Amino acid sequence: MTKLRRVAVMFSSLLIVLNCYAQEKDSTSLAKKTPGITSFILPTALVGYGLISLAGNNVIRDLDFTTKAELQEDHPLFAAHADNFLQFSPAAAVFALKFAGVKGRHQIGDAAGIYAMSMTMMTGSVTYLKKLSKRQRPDNSVNNSFPSGHTATVFASAEFLKQEYGKEYPWIAYTGYAVATATGALRMYNNRHWLSDVIAGAGFGIISTKASYILYPKLKRLFSRNQTSAFNLMPTYQSGGPGFYLSGNF
């Protein structure tokens, strides 16, 4: 229960901060129509579902074992590794559409910044919980099963696609989430994750992207407030992961 309390405190604090930001009036075009706090209810419930499975023997954990048994019984030799590249496909679609000239919510620079922030938040939270939970994978390979990183990545990407193009092209959003769901299913069919790993991973991914749409405009405005100091905040990829590069002239 100590693990659950620590994670619960972290998420409660995050949601309080996001609620404060979401309720602020914002006159800039970048911050228009940011996700409201109510949009975090479903992904938070998904994370909560997964956290309950860490509490020991309960109905949710039992469902993990029965789901694994059924999948292994029906498809004992299943092996398909499309999930390794599918996890990035919704985000790749966003940038492909932007390069093709299809207008979304943001210009490509801001979209890249939002996505980099989402990936940074998602990777940090997932990596921390993998080390904290030390859950063994269903194939008994390693103890870093919870939550599913592939699923978190693809759902963060699917939410990114939805936020950028879902209003004008709803079918694009549906396609992104269909790909995300298929990726999560493949993680279980390949015997790499439990059901609760996948469900929690989906929640972490969605929360990371929604939070980035709230926090990125605040962070960008913070560094551009002083016009006499030329600051530039740019997304970057280094040391095997996404991040930000800040430069400035004083």
Name these PLM-found stretches.
Residues 94-98, 126-127:
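Membrane-embedded alpha-helical segments in integral membrane proteins
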Residues 84, 100-101, 166, 171:
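Short, flexible segments with low predicted structural confidence
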Residues 23-93, 130-139:
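N-terminal transmembrane-helix/juxtamembrane module of multi-pass inner/ER membrane proteins
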Residues 101-121:
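Interfacial segments of alpha-helical transmembrane regions
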Residues 79-82, 112, 116, 148:
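Hydrophobic alpha-helical transmembrane segments of multi-pass membrane proteins
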Residues 54-55, 98-103:
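Structural signal for the C-terminal ends of transmembrane alpha-helices
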